[in-house]
Design a protein with these regions (language model features):
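Sec-dependent N-terminal signal peptides
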Residues: 3-12
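Short, solvent-exposed turn/loop segments enriched in Gly/Ser/Thr/Pro and often Arg
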Residues: 144-149, 159, 222-229, 666-667
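Aromatic- and acidic-residue-enriched segments that line the glycan-binding/catalytic groove
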Residues: 153-170
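Short, compositionally biased "basic patch" segments
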Residues: 169-180, 320-330
Length: 805
């Protein structure tokens, strides 16, 4: 007994001593707030923190970034809370169970070069564990110290390489001038704070899985802004989405009042109720809001120009230590407010997820199975349930395409997305035909309705619909779409109607299979095949084991493919006709570097590497000038500015047969050489107020397009809705406008300024023109925007494989 008592005393004494003497410097090699910590050091820090405070913390690795860096959470609470994490989680998710532990989730550094956030996360965790035990008795705090470790290390490594020993505070010093692309973005140059809902990036996918397992009551997204700005905290600016409750608004006022108390005591300046609104659903504040939490953004002066110290416009010196201190104060104040309102947080969260008094109760989605399955996979990531309807029943509904009420007869394979579920509010936000704007002055796009983004027919119903049952998440396909007698087949024909078709084509070309596409529609064995259909003839691949290669190329893909016993078609041109064009495997280049939009560059990069899975060459502008373009067939140019010398080099290459693909305003580099022109330009804004500017703007509105269906760029499209983010109107004097806005064009959804509503008729969306032996494709509205406009992906493949074939 005496020995046991001695052991208990020793363990207690050692734990007490360790907690009192925990040293950040001993782990990091520097005091917090004096230097930037690398991500490896951050991982070590939290491992040591968990070792020193084992009873009040649990460390969990939830994934890794594109570049293999650890994504982790630390759970902080009382000893009893940490022992019973799974029970607490189950009690919370099952809202019928009486729960008493609110969950506060603090997220830091979603933008890599806003790098004081992770330093603040380390300090906040230490203070909570060491000094705030009374809060831990009644709260569970989850900290994600770095949502974007690849971007953060990109910035931290730059700063360590170029900062002087004395840490020059002059903003013109090299250490304050990040090189392209900067640390804000992740590996693929995506803005992870715009990806919460769309989940195009692996970091987002892994984080959202963990988030939805916990569904916190409070979520804070910690950011930085320009070096001359004062600290921002809620309440947020209008517009608020209409589903945000009075309680969610009120809690933001509690937060603002409590933060102000601490900031006032330290004479720190701040602002609220401006700039940062609560509308676009893919932010780190709105996504939690639409899932019942109190979602908030905090913004500290800093970012990539700040370094560890910088002289601001008013002559003050902003230090890393200042930035960390402000974030720590706001973080701890958040936990305190949650502690003071813990009962309300629990009850109001439950109320939010039990109130579905929305206009539309069900959404019927109809379309090709691959589009429906792509949508279902996204919804499954968000834990949104989908139902199988009763085919043949007729429902009264609002039609997304006709923009009017109609009677719709439900088809086989249609799906129902319904609001009477835990994620019902999120369903409303993602599917509503039009988003209500309480204020048109907003921080981001104003339209995103998923049926338009995925190219699906949709019908919104005011009632809950009868159904057969719940539909599970679609499995990855493992299709072998080849009959047993395929070895006697004359050819294989595959419809061109999705990115699955494009990936299938790319796989075939990589194994030297000869593939042709149909320039015109044809009918065979009673099946109608539209232009773009792929034809793989056995006779043209006689030296290959074509059956085996097709089986391999089709694995994991959902394709509409058949075999045929003859090349003699029932309607249209026979397979030996010159109307079937052979597809060559293209050598693709992507222009990247200084002067180009990192975001648009990343969208194209991600598309080529992750969507299409094709090899390509990424080159800086100077490399093009040094080595030329003769080894490329296709050059993709993201938004940005080019030198006159580079424009000449590119146009010489196009004239000799190159295929140029231009995105957005990159077309303006070629006004002197090509027929495209800017016919209506937004007025200069410098003499206008912020609200006056709105009359000249389009802030992410959805329009229906007129399509030239005989052109190769339209292969695979019957309809297309574009997401316009600019009021500038481009037109082509030669070539072909393949997708354009029709007469009397009005926005289907989203905000359009009063002075530009009438100016959109005939606006070019996607077009193409010949230049010498080559061609130029224009994507004025970016079909790869943030990777979420799913129905835009195929037209980029059309530009790569079919244009100027």
């Amino acid at each position: 007994m005496k020995i046991l008592l001695i052991l208990v005393i020793i363990v207690f004494t050692n734990n007490f001593f360790a907690q009192k003497t925990f040293s950040s410097k001993s782990v990091l090699g520097h005091e917090l707030g004096t230097e930037f910590s690398t991500h490896a050091q951050v991982v070590d820090y939290f491992e040591e923190l968990n070792r020193v405070f084992p009873n009040n913390s649990k460390l969990e690795i939830y994934g890794e970034s594109n570049e293999g860096r650890t994504l982790q959470l630390i759970f902080i609470g009382s000893e009893n809370t940490i022992k019973n994490l799974e029970q607490i989680r189950n009690n919370h998710i099952n809202t019928s169970v009486n729960e008493n532990i609110p969950i506060v989730w603090l997220s830091y550094n979603v933008h890599g070069n806003e790098s004081s956030g992770t330093e603040a996360a380390m300090e906040t965790a230490l203070i909570l564990l060491r000094d705030k035990k009374e809060w831990l008795d009644d709260l569970l705090i989850i900290i994600d110290p770095c949502l974007n470790p690849d971007g953060r290390d990109r910035y931290v490594n730059f700063f360590k390489q170029y900062s002087t020993v004395s840490k020059n505070s002059n903003v013109r010093s090299l250490e304050h001038q990040e090189p392209w692309p900067g640390g804000r973005f992740n590996h693929y140059l995506f803005d992870l704070n715009r990806d919460w809902a769309w989940l195009t990036q692996v970091e987002s996918q892994q984080r959202i899985k963990k988030y939805n397992q916990w569904m916190p009551h409070v979520h804070v997204d910690v950011h930085e802004q320009g070096i001359n700005e004062n600290y921002y905290f809620p309440p947020a600016a209008e517009p608020y989405h209409e589903i945000i409750t009075d309680w969610q608004r009120k809690f933001q006022e509690y937060i603002g009042e409590n933060h102000a108390k601490y900031f006032d005591a330290n004479n720190w300046l701040y602002f609220s109720k401006e700039i940062f609104d609560l509308l676009y659903p893919s932010y780190g504040d709105t996504y939690p809001m639409y899932n019942g939490a109190i979602g908030m953004t905090y913004e500290q002066a800093g970012s990539g120009r700040a370094g560890t110290s910088v002289v601001t416009a008013n002559g003050d010196t902003l230090t890393l230590s200042d930035r960390v201190e402000h974030h720590v104060a706001a973080s701890l104040s958040t936990v305190e407010v949650a502690y003071l309102h813990k009962k309300e947080l629990i009850s109001e969260f439950q109320n939010f997820n039990n109130d579905f008094s929305y206009t539309y109760q069900s959404y019927v989605l109809s379309g090709d199975s691959y589009k429906l399955n792509a949508l279902r996979r996204l919804l499954a990531h968000h834990d949104i349930q989908v139902r199988e309807p009763k085919a043949g029943s007729v429902v009264k509904a609002w039609s997304y395409s006709s923009q009017e009420k109609t009677n719709y007869k439900i088809k086989q394979n249609d799906i129902i997305v319904f609001v009477d579920q835990l994620k019902g509010p999120m369903v409303k936000v993602l599917f509503e035909p039009q988003t209500f704007l309480s204020d048109s002055l907003t921080y981001d796009i104003t339209a995103w309705s998923l049926p338009y983004a995925f190219g699906l027919n949709a019908f919104a119903c005011v009632t809950e619909l009868p159904f057969k049952g719940e539909l599970p998440e679609p499995n990855e396909f493992s299709i072998t779409p080849i009959p047993n007698d395929s070895k006697d087949a004359f050819a294989y024909v595959c419809k061109w109607n999705s990115m699955e078709s494009a990936r299938f084509l790319e796989r075939l070309l990589s194994t030297n299979v000869k593939v042709k596409y149909a320039k015109k529609s044809f009918q065979l064995d009673g099946n109608l095949y539209e232009p773009g259909t792929l034809v793989i003839a056995r006779g043209e691949n006689s030296e290959l084991n074509i059956d085996s290669l097709i089986i391999q190329a089709s694995k994991g893909l959902e394709l509409q493919m058949n075999t045929c016993s003859t090349g003699y078609v029932e309607k249209g041109n026979d397979f030996g006709s010159s109307s079937y064009h052979e597809i060559q495997s293209p050598k693709i280049g992507l222009l990247a570097g200084e002067g180009h939009s990192p975001l648009n560059t990343g969208e194209i990069w991600h598309y080529l590497e992750q969507r299409l899975k094709t090899p390509f060459l990424m080159s800086r502008p100077n490399d093009i000038l040094d080595f030329g373009l003769s080894n490329l067939d296709v050059l993709m140019v993201p938004e940005g500015r080019l030198s006159a010398e580079l424009v000449d080099e590119i146009m010489t290459w196009v004239k000799s047969g190159g295929r140029l693909v231009l995105f957005g305003e990159s077309v303006e580099n070629f006004f002197d050489e090509l027929s495209i022109e800017l016919t209506d330009q937004t007025d200069e804004f410098y003499e206008m107020s912020e609200r006056e500017e709105l009359s000249e703007m389009i802030t992410g509105a959805i329009f229906n397009c007129k399509i030239e269906k005989k052109h190769v760029l339209s292969f695979g499209y019957d309809t297309y809705y574009t997401l316009r983010q600019s009021a500038s109107r481009y037109t082509l004097n030669a070539g072909k406008a393949v997708f354009e806005l029709p007469k009397n064009s009005k926005a289907i959804s989203g905000f359009v300024g009063s002075n530009v509503i009438e100016d959109q008729e005939g606006a070019l969306i996607v077009g193409q023109e010949q230049y010498g032996k080559g061609s130029v494709t224009y994507f004025i509205d970016n079909p790869l925007f943030r990777g979420f406009w799913s129905n835009g992906l195929l037209m980029v493949a059309n530009a790569i494989y079919f244009v100027n074939d």
